[in-house]
Amino acid sequence: MFTETLRKYPILPFLDRKCCIDYDLPAPTGTGKIKLPVGTGVYIPVLGIHYDPKYFPQPEKFDPDRFTEENKRSRPNYTYIPFGEGPRMCIGKDRHLNFPIRILGYSN
């Protein structure tokens, strides 16, 4: 339930990064390339990815079953990134994922 909530309402609608190597992206038209030199700022549209029906069918619908093990395996990596990924991901990720356990522990 928490994962689906963060899919629909991520903490940040985008992540910003800088290219650390020169990179060529395929052009949206299918011909040519877009060059991204070292130091270029890049925005990763988290909200756009989380609402892309290619990865999350009926993205407006609240459906916690999207995150069953079977459904998670059927999606490409990095299509669910509410905390970012890699060495610059949010340091609060583990705290959030353990939050329900702490709440239940206090209620006993």
Question: Where are the predicted features?
Answer:
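Conserved cytochrome P450 K-helix E-x-x-R motif and the immediately C-terminal K′/meander segment
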Residues: 1-32
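Conserved cytochrome P450 K-helix/beta-meander segment immediately N-terminal to the heme-binding cysteine loop
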Residues: 9, 44-71
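Active-site-adjacent bridging/hinge elements
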Residues: 16, 70-81
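Residue "hotspots" at secondary-structure boundaries inside conserved domains
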Residues: 32-34, 54
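Cytochrome P450 heme-binding "Cys pocket" and the immediately downstream C-terminal segment
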Residues: 94-108
